[in-house]
Amino acid sequence: MSEQQTMSELKQQALVDINEANDERALQEVKVKYLGKKGSVSGLMKLMKDLPNEEKPAFGQKVNELRQTIQNELDERQQMLVKEKLNKQLAEETVDVSLPGRHIEIGSKHPLTRTIEEIEDLFLGLGYEIVNGYEVEQDHYNFEMLNLPKSHPARDMQDSFYITDEILLRTHTSPVQARTMESRHGQGPVKIICPGKVYRRDSDDATHSHQFTQIEGLVVDKNVKMSDLKGTLELLAKKLFGADREIRLRPSYFPFTEPSVEVDVSCFKCKGKGCNVCKHTGWIEILGAGMVHPNVLEMAGFDSSEYSGFAFGMGPDRIAMLKYGIEDIRHFYTNDVRFLDQFKAVEDRGDM
């Protein structure tokens, strides 16, 4: 058998073996069989010793060409095996996107959170700044800076959680206003709202809680008038309860404002005709307000002959109870999913 015939048969057999290799391990064995140090192609070089010198270069070239041909076939088969393996893996891991996905329960904002954010958004649009303060407060800022000295009889109006004689849980967010006025007097107008939790020694029932939320507002500037306060409160009432709402101001008393008023809104359920919500009066009380007392301005460093201001305070708990017909304030704090899920449905309808 000639060398040419031997190489031709070797090539054909190598191609058959390569095509029959069904995995990378089998293909590696074929490579060793033909191209390894002791492989068939390497063995052809042993035939060169029996060839005339003038034929050796041509023979060596043909052996190298055969080696390259087999290597190319091996590389091609290798790529094919890798592709087949990947396709098989993809087929096994295929996700049927036509199937319905897993239902993921999505929560919703707590009704108090939504009410607070609604109020905050309104006042941010009016140029107010949101200021937060300490929940553990000094008696000085919680009472004395608000025209409530230790001897003032109005202190009996609200029982407090005292930690020491001078430290307590704040009973309102008014200390934030006092601290802000004290730190900013002489720096221009003050225009802030102060949301947060407050604490009072009340027995928990349907309308009272030892912990609840409050939002207070404060404006201090030159020539601030009662009419400015009334216009602000009218806008607030329409935003919270509907564009056709009206407000009513009734004289009242707060130590830190003078004059002081209670603010009522026309009943959004009966349109002022009288119902169980408004106790058949046509009006619902929503907040307290007034012009900042000159003593409060002076204690904070403002000249009360030059500056004036108004303040107001409301309970988002009460606002939310009125808006959504909630009869017991304790529902807000008991984490009852059955209660909270009702507001998820309202939110989905876009009513909140």
Swiss-Prot record:
Keyword set, alphabetical order: Aminoacyl-tRNA synthetase, ATP-binding, Cytoplasm, Ligase, Magnesium, Metal-binding, Nucleotide-binding, Protein biosynthesis
EC code: 6.1.1.20
Any one GO molecular-function label of the UniProt entry: catalytic activity, acting on a protein
GO biological process annotation, one example: phenylalanyl-tRNA aminoacylation
Similarity section: Belongs to the class-II aminoacyl-tRNA synthetase family. Phe-tRNA synthetase alpha subunit type 1 subfamily.
NCBIfam families: pheS (TIGR00468)
Protein's name in the database: Phenylalanine--tRNA ligase alpha subunit
Gene designation per UniProt: pheS
